[in-house]
């Protein structure tokens, strides 16, 4: 059983970065819990432990000691950036690391960038405690800048946090070679959606407000990602990169 350790940054008496009506500790916990839930919903062959599942205080040493004693296979620390920049970046230790550390990070970075429209700030290295003191491959992600209005507005959207979490979950699964559960896109058959209403909006991103183009009844599209929750509804991502509702009132899903 593969052991995944999720570490929502900060918490309790340590709010982390604070700006634009947001607290880093709240956002990191939301993303980590969503990541856990997606992994448990879509993948098998793993177990997950978290440094915290509520607003509690944990020192850096407590986090790495817990992961080390548990024997985690991968340590993923989730953070929100600050300092006036914009975009997503992630870090591995700037000292000697295993090949898996690099490979795992590359896969995670790629999957997150598939999901978000943050500026890609690249793959970096640093001497952070959680990267240095963890005895397994470890990565620290920085998901947008809390003190930059454009990034903060995205972080205020629960649907956008879903996308960040989906990127983390899929990246972790790719890195560790987790198997998809049957019924969650792993059947080997290609999925399609057919529009069954006279006209229907598609979306540029997984956001009901980000409308793209109208498609018409009878049009069929290749599904790139099985349905996932967005706000109060569900969407599919299409091979074209656009998104479409998964409501059976408007589309028919089938495989072949």
Predicted regions and their residues:
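Active-site-proximal helix/loop segments of hydrolytic enzymes
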Residues: 2-4, 22, 26-184
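Short, well-ordered turn and helix-capping elements at secondary-structure junctions
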Residues: 10, 52, 94-96, 127, ...
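Active-site/binding-pocket entry motifs
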Residues: 12, 114, 146-147, 201, ...
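Hydrophobic alpha-helical context, especially transmembrane and signal-peptide helices
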Residues: 12, 19, 113, 156, ...
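Beta-loop motif signature
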Residues: 185-235, 243-256
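Short, solvent-exposed loop/turn elements at domain surfaces
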Residues: 14-16, 100, 201-204
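Short glycine-rich His-centered loop
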Residues: 2-21
